[in-house]
Amino acid sequence: FSYETVRKALFKYLDLECAEPDAVKIPELPFRPPVLCAGCPHRASFYAAKVATKGMNAVYCGDIGCYTLGNAAPLNMVDTCLCMGAGITIAQGLTLAEPGKKCLSFAGDSTFFHTGIPGVINAVYQNTDITIVVLDNHTTAMTGQQPHPGTGVTAMGEKTKALDIETML
């Protein structure tokens, strides 16, 4: 039952007048651009990459995840973003299309495990000169803290061996 149905039934049962409640005026909220959360480790990672590539002709290939928000000021560290797992392969294509550019790819740990590994395999196989930055916060943060192969916990909550990203790369 809805709140309104229960309210009307109670007023009728108690033989009370059931006046319609006054509408609540919702205040207009100020504009707030999307930003990385306070304390997010990706802020420092993006800043470090920005400092390290200063003066280079760099392209920053992003991916789908909360770190996509690295595209906004003051970081401005995501030039491309297409779909989950595309950042690594887009960096490869851009390196071939524009050899003078330094291409960095940013992928979260969850994206790395779910769709990034084939791109890494291709980059190694093709001997492509790209930099892959895996932003590892040990969870699937954007969609609710789900485990992934790097967490050591299965989707059913069972403990298992965590896969180590650095060892895999």
How should these model regions be labeled?
Residues 1, 38-43, 111-112:
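Gly/Ser/Thr-rich loops at beta-strand to alpha-helix junctions
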Residues 1-20:
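Terminal amphipathic helices with adjacent charged low-complexity linkers/tails
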Residues 6, 37, 60-62, 123, ...:
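Generic structural hydrophobic/aromatic packing signal, biased to beta-strands
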Residues 6, 10, 49, 90-91:
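Generic hydrophobic alpha-helical segments
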Residues 18-87, 97:
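Active-site diphosphate/adenylate-binding microenvironment
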Residues 71-169:
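Thiamine diphosphate
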